[in-house]
């Protein structure tokens, strides 16, 4: 493994740690503020953080000796896909993150991390509706994840906690969000699209907050560190590290490293929030993580 790949892997591991521990920050934030104001405040910061990052990448791109400016037609197409994609992805992100933020109030950060990570298994399955191919290993991953979800969430009387169910809805919405991003990013500017999607999620969160919840400056200040961590580190820093690192990392290794987000979510819940899980739930976490890994294993191409 060369030095660039090693650095890339280390940065992706750091990204997984940041994203994973953000679940604990989200849970802490719910002690002081309601879900929609938390999301709105978080996405304000995320949007602001990405603006200088956009400027940085634009300047870096133009300094590249091989840089060829886009034609007026190419720029118009990219702008259209960036704006449309940002708004569409932002709407999906708003719904997904809102379900997550509401659900985490009623369950643990660790369980939220693992249930949310199911989107990795669901994305290729939902891709069937877009005529994308699904490997047999993906279906194995789906079957294993169903067993893991049962062990993690289903109680002895075959009921499921409200928080776990809401977070499961969040994982479905994140899978849809990923497919939306995949559809638009090929022809859009990915950093600008991300900034617009954060801004869209921010506006929708503020509308929902003013319409349904109580907003207080005291609550926002009390949840300040959690909001700052999720907005600046999880969104701004995490997204930037992912972009930089994936250029020098094998895609399979990259996806596996980022899957560790769920593990660090559980670790963060244990050390930061002192959360514990029953043996059955821990086994469920292990089984679900195995499903996530299996679903991402690439099959050799047929000759």
Give the role of each language-model region.
Residues 43, 51-59, 67-69, 223-225, ...:
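C-terminal-most transmembrane helix of multi-pass membrane proteins
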Residues 36, 46-50, 123-124, 159-213, ...:
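Transmembrane alpha-helical segments that form core, pore/gating elements
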Residues 4-9, 32-40, 78-82, 139, ...:
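Juxtamembrane helix-entry segments on the extracytoplasmic side of multipass membrane proteins
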Residues 39-41, 112-118, 181-202, 235-271:
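Helix-helix packing/entry segments at the starts of transmembrane helices
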Residues 22-23, 54-116, 151, 231-249:
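Specific transmembrane alpha-helical segments of multi-pass solute transporters/efflux pumps
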Residues 50, 134-154, 174, 205, ...:
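Hydrophobic transmembrane alpha-helices of multi-pass small-molecule transport proteins
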């Amino acid at each position: 493994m060369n030095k660039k790949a090693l650095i890339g892997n280390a940065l992706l591991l750091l990204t997984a740690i940041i994203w994973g521990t953000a679940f604990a920050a989200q849970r802490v934030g719910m002690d002081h503020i309601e879900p929609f104001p938390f999301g709105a405040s978080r996405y304000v910061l995320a949007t602001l953080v990405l603006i200088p990052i956009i400027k940085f990448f634009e300047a870096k791109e133009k300094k590249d000796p091989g840089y060829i400016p886009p034609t007026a037609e190419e720029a118009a197409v990219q702008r259209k896909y960036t704006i449309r994609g940002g708004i569409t992805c932002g709407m999906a992100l708003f719904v997904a993150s809102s379900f997550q933020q509401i659900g985490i109030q009623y369950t643990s950060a660790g369980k939220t991390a693992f249930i949310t990570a199911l989107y990795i298994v669901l994305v290729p399955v939902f891709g069937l509706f877009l005529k994308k191919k699904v490997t047999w290993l993906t279906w194995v991953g789906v079957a294993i994840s169903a067993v893991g979800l049962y062990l993690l969430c289903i109680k002895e009387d075959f009921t499921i906690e409200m928080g776990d169910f809401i977070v499961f809805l969040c994982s479905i919405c994140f899978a849809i969000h990923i497919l939306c991003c995949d559809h638009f990013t090929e022809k859009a500017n990915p950093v600008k699209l991300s900034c617009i999607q954060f801004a869209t999620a921010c506006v929708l969160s503020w509308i929902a907050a003013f319409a349904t919840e109580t907003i207080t400056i005291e609550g926002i200040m009390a949840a300040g560190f959690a909001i700052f961590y999720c907005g600046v580190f999880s969104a701004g820093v995490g997204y930037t590290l992912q972009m930089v690192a994936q250029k020098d990392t094998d895609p399979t290794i990259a996806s596996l490293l980022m899957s560790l987000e769920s593990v660090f979510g559980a670790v963060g819940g244990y050390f930061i929030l002192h959360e514990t899980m029953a043996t059955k739930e821990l086994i469920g976490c292990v089984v679900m993580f195995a499903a996530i890994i299996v679903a991402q294993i690439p099959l050799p191409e047929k000759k």
